[in-house]
């Protein structure tokens, strides 16, 4: 796409909405880290690092001091990104999505390297002492003496031997920003939090600028410690820039789906990237080819792909090695996974189709369900051969939703035609064992709510879970589907597999059945709406990583 004006805030808002499932309240954790920094960090050394960052020319010794300070801060923080390189294969992401991600990372790499003058971490050129002196003479020649600045201020230059040591040593952290404003500004932390909260509220509707900062400073004097200079590239988190303050303010807002509060975890990496690409294509976002500053999509993409675990925006990342394109790799060849070692004589035999790691992911997902909340359950297919399971908690929006390939394909086709509309070809790659793993992992004594409980109770008993109770709401078929169309209109993107044609069943004396496919998840949502009388204003959130739902089709061998 050719270069054009970027509607930055509109893109930011779109990304906030699209990634709202992965944003979290972080205010308490940020303040906790800020207190730890204040209690243990030597702020005399902090002042020296801030002085270094104001120098026009910085050397190897300056970089060493910055790295040492970053290491101390990292050790004090609980919110950090850890080194977790990711290899993405077809499965959770389609081949087209992998190709798109790979292309965007390559474009971003070229843009960053171009802006750095070919040397990673060194913006505006990595000039030697001789070149610096020569540049000074040339500036005098063209009328730009030492007292004459151009553009947005001084060009800061690093004159270091190994510029790769600069990677990931910059960028602000809200906990550090709050600590510096409190300790060095002589303010109470409560005043700082209040001031930054005001800045964060402005950020929910626009990018705060220096004029906004000046006006807010009248009500919150603590904000006067924020520099009035324009933000610069390669500036450390110890400098109290406006962008650092805005980031900290975003963390003080428990709401607004702020991108700054995203937390990455390996199981959810593909899900988050998939959501990002969907928003990108809907809003026609792109990676530009010119300029130093990153647009919102570029900024998000870089931060997410730098590490698959931790806080990409607000955590300490100074101990991470490599750049985003180094740490997130795309494997389009799909090499077969290594076969497990044979079971030794007398050793335990694992009959589960899931690996230990996959079972752990299911257990982690199920543990996020609250035993105290209303929990709906529904299946498609008979209890002995289910093809779909959904468990939904309407108060939080959390749900578990998975599929299973049927054993009895003939019976499945009849069920598809008259009920669920699932197609056999769409279930061939469904990962086996998920339904059993979910039921086994449910909390002891959990109460499940269902519309029609016979098949659910059979399924539960088949897994030996006599401790689980199933409550049947016993709605009539017609009453149960009062909210069917509104639910499908609103939540249709959650259901992508029920694409087959459904035919009405003809029963004497009964109203004609619906020709909408029966989706276990949609049914749970509409049954809850029928019981409560309204569709809840909560966004459903899948707890199972999408990588786990289906087998890697590139690893399948056709014999």
Swiss-Prot record:
Site residues by UniProt (Important for exonuclease activity): 455
Chain positions recorded as Zn(2+) binding sites: 388, 495, 498, 519
Binding site for Mn(2+): 378, 380, 523
Compartments (UniProt record): Virion; Host cytoplasm
Enzyme class (EC, first level): hydrolase
GO cellular component, one term: viral nucleocapsid
InterPro entries in alphabetical order: Nucleocapsid_arenaviridae (IPR000229), Nucleocapsid_C_arenaviridae (IPR035084), Nucleocapsid_C_sf (IPR038115), Nucleocapsid_N_arenaviridae (IPR035083)
Family named by the database record: Belongs to the arenaviridae nucleocapsid protein family.
Organism for this UniProt entry: Parana mammarenavirus (isolate Rat/Paraguay/12056/1965) (PARV)
E.C. number: 3.1.13.-
Keywords annotated in UniProt: Capsid protein, Helical capsid protein, Host cytoplasm, Host-virus interaction, Hydrolase, Inhibition of host IKBKE by virus, Inhibition of host innate immune response by virus, Inhibition of host RLR pathway by virus, Interferon antiviral system evasion, Manganese, Metal-binding, Ribonucleoprotein, RNA-binding, Viral immunoevasion, Viral nucleoprotein, Virion, Zinc
Assembly notes: Homomultimerizes to form the nucleocapsid. Binds to viral genomic RNA. Interacts with glycoprotein G2. Interacts with protein Z; this interaction probably directs the encapsidated genome to budding sites. Interacts with protein L; this interaction does not interfere with Z-L interaction. Interacts with host IKBKE (via Protein kinase domain); the interaction inhibits IKBKE kinase activity.
Protein name, entry field: Nucleoprotein
């Amino acid at each position: 796409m050719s270069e054009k004006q970027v509607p930055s805030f509109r893109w930011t808002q779109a990304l906030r909405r699209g990634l709202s499932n992965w944003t979290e309240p972080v205010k308490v954790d940020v303040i906790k880290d800020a207190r730890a920094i204040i209690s243990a960090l030597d702020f005399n050394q902090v002042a020296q690092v801030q002085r270094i960052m104001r120098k026009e020319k910085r050397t190897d010794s300056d970089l060493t001091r910055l790295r040492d300070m970053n290491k101390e801060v990292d050790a004090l923080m609980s919110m950090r990104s850890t080194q977790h390189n990711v290899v993405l294969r077809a499965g959770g992401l389609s081949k087209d999505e992998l190709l798109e991600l790979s292309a965007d990372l390559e474009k971003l790499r070229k843009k960053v390297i171009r802006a750095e003058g070919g040397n990673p971490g060194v913006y505006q050129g990595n000039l030697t002492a001789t070149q610096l002196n020569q540049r000074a003479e040339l500036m005098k020649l063209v009328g730009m003496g030492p007292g004459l600045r151009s553009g947005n201020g001084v060009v800061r230059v690093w004159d270091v031997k190994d510029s790769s040591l600069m990677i990931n040593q910059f960028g602000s952290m809200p906990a550090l920003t709050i600590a510096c404003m409190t300790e060095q500004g002589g303010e109470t932390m409560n005043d700082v939090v209040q001031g930054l909260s005001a800045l964060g509220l402005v950020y929910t509707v626009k990018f705060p600028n220096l004029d906004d900062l000046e006006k807010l400073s009248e009500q919150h004097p603590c904000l006067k410690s924020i520099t009035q200079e324009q933000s610069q590239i390669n500036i450390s988190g110890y400098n109290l820039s406006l962008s650092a303050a805005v980031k900290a303010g975003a963390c003080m807002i428990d709401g607004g789906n702020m991108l700054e509060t995203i937390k990455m975890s390996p199981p959810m990496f593909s899900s988050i990237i998939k959501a990002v690409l969907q928003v990108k294509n809907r809003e026609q976002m792109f990676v530009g080819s010119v300029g130093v500053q990153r647009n919102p999509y570029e900024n998000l993409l870089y931060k997410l792909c730098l590490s698959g675990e931790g806080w990409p925006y607000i955590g300490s990342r100074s101990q991470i090695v490599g750049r985003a394109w180094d740490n997130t790799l795309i494997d389009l060849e799909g090499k077969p996974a290594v076969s497990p070692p044979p079971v030794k004589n007398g050793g335990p035999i694992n009959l589960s189709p899931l690996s230990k790691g996959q079972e752990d992911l299911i257990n982690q997902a199920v543990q996020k369900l609250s035993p105290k909340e209303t929990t709906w359950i529904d299946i498609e297919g008979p209890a002995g051969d289910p093809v779909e399971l959904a468990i939904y908690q309407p108060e939080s929006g959390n749900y578990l939703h998975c599929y299973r390939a049927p054993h009895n394909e003939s019976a499945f086709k009849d069920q598809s035609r008259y009920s669920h509309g699932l197609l056999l070809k769409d279930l061939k790659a469904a990962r086996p064992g998920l339904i059993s793993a979910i039921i086994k992992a449910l909390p002891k004594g959990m109460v499940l709510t269902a519309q029609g409980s016979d098949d659910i109770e059979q399924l539960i008993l088949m897994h030996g879970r006599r401790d689980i109770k199933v409550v049947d709401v016993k709605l009539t078929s017609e009453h149960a589907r009062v909210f069917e169309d509104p639910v499908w209109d609103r939540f249709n993107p959650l259901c992508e597999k029920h694409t087959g044609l459904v035919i009405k069943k003809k029963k004497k004396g009964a109203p004609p059945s619906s020709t909408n496919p029966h989706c276990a998840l949609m049914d749970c949502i509409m049954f809850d709406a029928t019981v409560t009388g309204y569709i809840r204003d909560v966004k459903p959130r899948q707890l199972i990583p999408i990588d786990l739902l289906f087998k890697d089709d590139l690893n399948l061998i056709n014999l």
